[in-house]
Amino acid sequence: MIFRWLLLVSCLLVALIPQQSSAKKSDQPKVTATKLEHEPFSLFYFEDSETVLMSLKNGEFKQSFDGGEEWEDVASSEDGRVTQPVVFIRQHPFDKNKAYALGVDGHHLVTTDQAKTWRSFDIGDQPALQHPPLVFHGWDSSKVIYQSEECAGFFCITVRLLRESAAGCSWAVGHPHFAEDMDLNQELKDRSLCVVPGLKVPFGHANRLVYSDDYFVSNIEGTEVNLHEGRPVSGVISTAAVKKFIVAAVKSKGTEELALFVTTDTNTWHRAEFDGHRIEQDAYTMLESTNYSLQVDVLTSPSSNMGVLFTSNSNGTFFSRNIEHTNRDMEGTVDFEKIAGIQGIVMVNTVKNPKEVKSGQAKKVISRISFDDGRSFQPLKVGDKNLHLHSVTTFANIGRVFSSPAPGLVMGIGNTGDHLQKYSDGDLYISDDAGVTWRHALDGPHKYEFGDQGAVVMAISDKGKSNKISFSLDHGKEWGSVEIEHKIYPTMVTTTPDSTSLRFLLVGKQNEESGFIVYSIDFKGLHERKCEEDDFEKWPARLDENGEPDCLMGHKQFFRRRKANADCFVDEEFKDPQPIMEPCKCTAEDFECEFKGSEDGKSCIPALLPVPPEGCKNPDDTFMGPSGWRLIPGDTCIRDGGKNLDHDVEWRCKDAGNVPTSGEISVEKQYFDARQFSAYYYLERQSSSSGNDETIVMLTSERALYVSHDHGKTWKQPLKGEAINRIVPHPYNSDGAFLLTDGAEGFWTVDRGQSFKPFDAPAPPTEERLPTLTFHPQYQDWLIWTGAVDCGSGDCHSNAYISKNRGDNWELLQRYVQKCEFESREGRKDSTNLIFCEQFENENRNNRLQLVSSKNWFSDSTVHFRDVINYATMSEFIVVASRDTEKPDSLVASSSVDGETFAEAKFPPNVNVPVQTAYTVLESSTHAVFLHVTVSNSEGAEYGSIIKSNSNGTSYVLSLGAVNRNFRGYVDFEKMQGIEGVAVANVVSNVNKLSDGEPKKLRTMITHNDGGQWTLLSPPNKDAEGKDFGCSVEGEGVPGCSLHLHGYTERRDERDTFSSSSAIGLMLGVGNVGDHLGGEDEADTFITRDAGFTWKSVKKGRYIWEFGDAGSLIVIVPESKPTKTLYYSLDEGDTWLDFVFSDVEMQIDDISTVPSDTSKSFLLWGKELKSDYQDKLATVSVDFSGLRSSSCKLDENSAESHDYYLWEPKHPFQSDNCLFGHVEQYHRKKPSAQCWNDWREPHVHSIGENCPCTRADFECDYNYEPQSDGSCALVQGLAPPDAMAVCREDPEAYQYWEPSGYRRLPQSTCQGGREMDHIVSKPCPNREEEYKKKHGISGAGLFFAIVIPIAVASAVGYYGYTRWDGKFGQIRLGENVGTSQGLLSRDSLLITIPVTIIAGAVAVIKALPLLATSLWRSASGYVRLGRNRGYSRPYASRGSFAARRGDYTGVVDDEDELLGVEDLEADEEEEL
């Protein structure tokens, strides 16, 4: 007992003796190394943990739970399966517990508990490469979109398809801050956005943005997003979620300019304005932004990689300029970084010598810092010296460049002096006051990182191999070091995302042989104690010019920060530093312009000033309205005692945005010192273009250039004194044009005539009638110049030169050429550098002309044809006319789709032209070439046949015979713009009498199914004066009584077409009603509103016309006849009003408007008669915009609205509205609507369900010709096409279809119905077994085919037996007749046996067709099998229709292309 007490007392005494500290201070950090055979590819920490994930370049996937000391392979917790190789790992950005690992084999992993467990899931499609493979929901971390190369899907626990054929999908809530202050949780929680192909065109300029609130379940197409003024926009490239914003980038065809649309709720979108700057594709970078503004850097100098930094207002609509000449690299990376955790501090690098850089000198980069959110910038200072630091474009680590969550600690590699030097010559600099002052830290470049909220700073030399780690415990004032075991080339240094840990990870490469090493470096033992309250300071994050704490967003910001000299660690892992906010009184900096600011920045311009109820009677009257200022959302300033800029102010009525319009048409007349114009072109803004100009460039007969930006109201002479010979508009960029002179000098504009820059060509323009300039479709600065060489000697010839910088430099491409063209096309594989040239053999003009091509600027080339006459490019086809080797006086046509393989065209036998002298390529926008083959080229008797190709342009069928052409080879054929498949042509009705000298008699015909069937035009019943025509018919026209129109061959300007792509369904023409087309003096003017079904007489006599405002406005004026009056219609030609545009009579030769026909202004070209200006060219600008004051309201999601209705094109031979196998719907303004369309890009509203196949979806096959009843019959004496050719051409084909006489129209999407091209299939030779497998009936199928009819027969017989009551036709009410045992009772053998036999026999007879059908379907694989490989497939959905490759646009803008011997004649006036 005593011993126990003594033991207890001894223990107590020992306990009272002072003990040595358990946490003994160490001089060195703890270092642990892990060797790897392969390089780490991706590495990250889970937030608030020591767990690290790492993937290696060979696909290995590892994890560590102790900050990198020990590593293990990641495996599924379900089956222990290791997912390798892993191609992508990603931490969920909004859920710190989740991460995803995507495997290359479709097997993937997800963790929801920071890698403690992993769950596998399978998606077979490969992860996307061009888009982020995983897209995360900002509110609900269980929702993820998986984007693959094939499609896009979303998954949580299960995986299901989201949207096929999407160019990219995202959640509407792409960030936790999105719509966080709005009551939109239910509306947005499941909303997804997808960029999808256009309904008719799969190329980028037609892409649409759609959304769905149920993962596209109820509507596979989704609902189109109204991006611009409540209407959808085409050309959507991508979307991006940036804090509380979503940004959509849009680019229209024909311009490089982008439009950015911004929303904060996905419902209301606005176009962002950039203070006069234009944004181009791949020329802007979305930077790290705040919760209250977007920051964007816009490329201004592509060749020298410089930009301008912009910051938006709080709704992202108006951007103000922050700083010019920001430094960028080729990938669009910008030297820009916000200091982490501190509001308003931004570091950027700019170019000091921008002018010298543009002339080819090296950049001199300097560093700048802003402490007021980019309003002003100042240099970085080390004492009195300027400091320049390497930034994002030369960053050599991961994570942020300069800062971390450690408050106020900033580091960088650079130098003092005039400008930034090479990275290898830089030193390490540090600041502990958020960049206000800097000091030198270590010599040489280093990789660096912050830990323990800045209490530890670690660095390692980045100049060669090193084994020395430097560290500082006092904000970089003094440095210690520790050596590691191996010398390494460091590749990355990192730590926990919040920089609160004392443990760092260092990855380095030892040498080529020994692989990589991962070091875990733990500084926990370097201080003995944890910091106490006295070791902290209240540190102000921003200081003003007086050194006092500064206000931003209505408050001052402070941090509780460890003092630099405190000998302790904060040691609060995973506890982020929290800012302390103190409010300030409101100042002007707390307000922003609601719309945009004035030029001086001192006031705001409101988006719209509402006029008070009493209205504005006089422009100088005043009223009280909003100032245009507003408090920045999120600003916390105190209004009491501060500034208040958002109160109402006084405005004058003339400043109001909705003052009633004048109700009048305005006119401006201008005169020119020339008798006439030589040429004019519109440089039209596209939908994504900024500005509101309507630009025209015009060349007079005196070779003077004039430019107007207001549709001819005023004109300027920007190149006065320069003799311009020709205007060449850029065919792929409507902002650009080139102006050529007689010499080697020229000018160009790429900003719609705002400026013109000179360029020097390598030679004067070619003296032959050849294209001098040709352009690349995608790279719009790539040019080919064809110039005249050695013309002073006897060997004048043309050479081709190429420039890739808009004429700054030229290189010789080919010598002795006729023409050279880029043949790059969307959908044509590997064609970026593809060029075709017509070149004389052996560079001798006396030799044959060859067609050659090259993909490497003719370092080597391919000869396709050795005796070519000409070639033409139309849509996806290259068509070549070459001499027939067997008939030198005849031609052979060949075509290619890929630009590599050419196939000779197979002409139909009913086009019998023994000597083929000329072809005219008419049009090929519907996956088929329309080719006019000249049959007769006798003067005054020219005509030919229009033949139409299959989808690869090789096999032709007759579409229409005896089609009129003129001596120059142009053809009376025109496609209707805006609606596919409608075309008008003039045929010669008296072909047999032309040889007798009788003049041609023309009739006009129309097709509604792309040339498959043609009819005469239906004549109107009465003329414009209400009088009857000499004949009358109901429905389509008949010989002797139909409408005939003067066509393409009689036009002064090929741009004066019947129709417009924006005026859907409308056509105007000049002609007459009768047996054939009469003279122009007999012609009247006619209009159709239903795409040519019915016509109405508009005016007696010949008029010229233009459409405006997408068809809601039509203007006509007498052609070449003294007049001072024009006529206009606001209801699609139903009624007409007159307007006197001149006080003296004029002769009007032309009327013009923008090519899209969407303007409300028109320009009349002519001369005054009997005036002092009668010898001068005059233009009259007529502006109708004052007639109406409002825009029409369109609801895309509603079939009908107050201002619009849905219109469907029809086919004359069908009762439904199916055209090419589907129903199209277009929005058209109601003629009675008193508003303007104001829509620059009308488009298909929808493509309805695919229709069953009918005769209209097919045309006659090769060697077949149409009969009088519309059927197709084999031409007498000819054999059907070789159906087995598909078996020889395609080694994978196992079947072929016997010729039926029909082939499907390439653009038809019909399904089922009368599939007239596929009736009987047969196996390919040696593929019978596979054919049987696909078509043969299985044992189970045979069993059911036999048993089911017998069972049905038995059931029917039994039914007849059990229901027989001996009283046919009786209605039994309550009788108990079942007990009757008479001869006619149902139990009688006289009844039971015959009834059973008869009923069974009837059932079997009725079942036999079902059995036959069942057997046939079984033999056909039940579901109809696919067609021959390479054939156009039908479509199961509108989604699949939208995915179809090809171009379904309207008529090609280019004039007809001529291919023929006649091109060689000296009198040929046109050359293509």
UniProtKB/Swiss-Prot annotation:
<comment type="similarity">
    <text>Belongs to the VPS10-related sortilin family.</text>
</comment>
<feature type="repeat" description="BNR 6">
    <location>
        <begin position="1127"/>
        <end position="1136"/>
    </location>
</feature>
<feature type="topological domain" description="Cytoplasmic">
    <location>
        <begin position="1357"/>
        <end position="1388"/>
    </location>
</feature>
<comment type="function">
    <text>Functions as a sorting receptor in the Golgi compartment required for the intracellular sorting and delivery of soluble vacuolar proteins, like carboxypeptidase Y (CPY) and proteinase A. Executes multiple rounds of sorting by cycling between the late Golgi and a prevacuolar endosome-like compartment.</text>
</comment>
<dbReference type="Pfam" id="PF15901">
    <property type="entry name" value="Sortilin_C"/>
</dbReference>
<keyword id="KW-0333">Golgi apparatus</keyword>
<dbReference type="GO" id="GO:0005829">
    <property type="term" value="C:cytosol"/>
</dbReference>
<keyword id="KW-0325">Glycoprotein</keyword>
<feature type="signal peptide">
    <location>
        <begin position="1"/>
        <end position="23"/>
    </location>
</feature>
<feature type="transmembrane region" description="Helical">
    <location>
        <begin position="1336"/>
        <end position="1356"/>
    </location>
</feature>
<dbReference type="InterPro" id="IPR015943">
    <property type="entry name" value="WD40/YVTN_repeat-like_dom_sf"/>
</dbReference>
<feature type="repeat" description="BNR 5">
    <location>
        <begin position="801"/>
        <end position="811"/>
    </location>
</feature>
<dbReference type="GO" id="GO:0016020">
    <property type="term" value="C:membrane"/>
</dbReference>
<keyword id="KW-0677">Repeat</keyword>
<feature type="transmembrane region" description="Helical">
    <location>
        <begin position="1389"/>
        <end position="1409"/>
    </location>
</feature>
<feature type="repeat" description="BNR 3">
    <location>
        <begin position="429"/>
        <end position="439"/>
    </location>
</feature>
<feature type="topological domain" description="Lumenal">
    <location>
        <begin position="1410"/>
        <end position="1472"/>
    </location>
</feature>
<feature type="topological domain" description="Lumenal">
    <location>
        <begin position="24"/>
        <end position="1335"/>
    </location>
</feature>
<dbReference type="GO" id="GO:0006623">
    <property type="term" value="P:protein targeting to vacuole"/>
</dbReference>
<dbReference type="GO" id="GO:0005794">
    <property type="term" value="C:Golgi apparatus"/>
</dbReference>
<keyword id="KW-0472">Membrane</keyword>
<keyword id="KW-0653">Protein transport</keyword>
<dbReference type="InterPro" id="IPR006581">
    <property type="entry name" value="VPS10"/>
</dbReference>
<feature type="repeat" description="BNR 4">
    <location>
        <begin position="706"/>
        <end position="716"/>
    </location>
</feature>
<dbReference type="GO" id="GO:0006895">
    <property type="term" value="P:Golgi to endosome transport"/>
</dbReference>
<keyword id="KW-0813">Transport</keyword>
<feature type="repeat" description="BNR 2">
    <location>
        <begin position="369"/>
        <end position="378"/>
    </location>
</feature>
<dbReference type="Pfam" id="PF15902">
    <property type="entry name" value="Sortilin-Vps10"/>
</dbReference>
<keyword id="KW-0812">Transmembrane</keyword>
<feature type="repeat" description="BNR 1">
    <location>
        <begin position="64"/>
        <end position="72"/>
    </location>
</feature>
<keyword id="KW-0675">Receptor</keyword>
<protein>
    <recommendedName>
        <fullName>Vacuolar protein sorting/targeting protein 10</fullName>
    </recommendedName>
</protein>
<dbReference type="GO" id="GO:0006896">
    <property type="term" value="P:Golgi to vacuole transport"/>
</dbReference>
<feature type="glycosylation site" description="N-linked (GlcNAc...) asparagine">
    <location>
        <position position="315"/>
    </location>
</feature>
<dbReference type="InterPro" id="IPR031778">
    <property type="entry name" value="Sortilin_N"/>
</dbReference>
<keyword id="KW-1133">Transmembrane helix</keyword>
<keyword id="KW-0732">Signal</keyword>
<feature type="glycosylation site" description="N-linked (GlcNAc...) asparagine">
    <location>
        <position position="291"/>
    </location>
</feature>
<feature type="glycosylation site" description="N-linked (GlcNAc...) asparagine">
    <location>
        <position position="952"/>
    </location>
</feature>
<dbReference type="InterPro" id="IPR031777">
    <property type="entry name" value="Sortilin_C"/>
</dbReference>
<dbReference type="InterPro" id="IPR050310">
    <property type="entry name" value="VPS10-sortilin"/>
</dbReference>
